[in-house]
Structure formats: structure tokens, C-alpha cells
Amino acid sequence: MQNFKPYYAVIFTSTQNINTEGYSEMAIKMETLAKKQEGFIGIDSARETVGITVSYWDSLDAIKNWKQQSEHLQAQLQGRNHWYSWYNVKICKVEREYEFNASK
């Protein structure tokens, strides 16, 4: 953990409307686009009744730039108008991390 550098996590939690036509395609497009953004570190995502996507960034500026990226702005608008019945966004600073892996 000697070389650990704190980073930021954007936690996007949501519930969807009944009509999700086009959602999966847009989610794939946004993940592909996010991976090209300066400061992007990674992403984890899961969806059942409630969906949670956590994206990781090296700075608050990188998060701000992603939020204001033109195609992402269009996706946000479509999400509010068509796909989501509710969502919540949290931005957190990750000071420490660790993991367990039984296969190692």
C-alpha cells in the first residue's frame, strides 16, 4: 500500500422506468466513451431492481469534465426523460482500498 494514491469514486444508483428501450446500447456507449476520458481509472456496475455503477477518477476535475462531456450530457437528458424513475449520485474520495481473493 506504499504506492497508493487516493482517487475519487462516483457512485450512481438508480431505478429504471418500465420502458428501457435503447438503454443498454447507451450504457455501452457511455462506458466506452468514459474509458477514453483523461483521468478515468475504471468502472464497476451491477443491475437488478436497483442499479449501481461506480466509476473511478484521478481527480475532481476529471469528474467535472466527464459530467460536462457533450455526449454524456445527452445521455443524462435521455436518462431523466426516458429511462430512470429515480437516481442518486455520490462523489467520494477513496483513501484506502484492499481486497480478498481466495484463488491467489
PLM regions: where:
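Short S/T/G/P-rich N-terminal loop/turn motif that feeds into the first structured element of a domain
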Residues: 1-51, 60-68, 84-104
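Sensory beta-strand/linker motifs that couple input domains to effectors
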Residues: 56
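Acidic/histidine-enriched, beta-strand-rich ligand/metal-binding domains
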Residues: 80-82
